[in-house]
From Swiss-Prot:
The keyword Zinc does not apply. The lineage of its organism: Eukaryota, Metazoa, Chordata, Craniata, Vertebrata. PROSITE patterns: DEFENSIN. ADP-ribosylation drastically reduces cytotoxic and antibacterial activities, and enhances IL8 production. The modification Phosphotyrosine is found at residue 85. This is Neutrophil defensin 1. The keyword Signal applies. It comes from Pan troglodytes.
Amino acid sequence: MRTLAILAAILLVALQAQAEPLQARADEVAAAPEQIPADNPEVVVSLAWDESLAPKHPGSRKNVACYCRIPACLAGERRYGTCIYQGRLWAFCC
């Protein structure tokens, strides 16, 4: 029973350690709100990320345009994650 409690504590510490950088990023985004018209269903987002997470397009070295869209990505785009803007979930599409 002690072993189970110790393993659970280690798991909780590991999860908390991973959550702190994500919370810091969310705080940075929340600190700089942008004014976007309500009638615009498309939001342009500029992000910095690890190269390993960048979209891979074979044979192309050009910059890739990424957008946060509702409800889904357009034809030819791929969903790479989720954006949270004004309390709503958006598809992060490139």
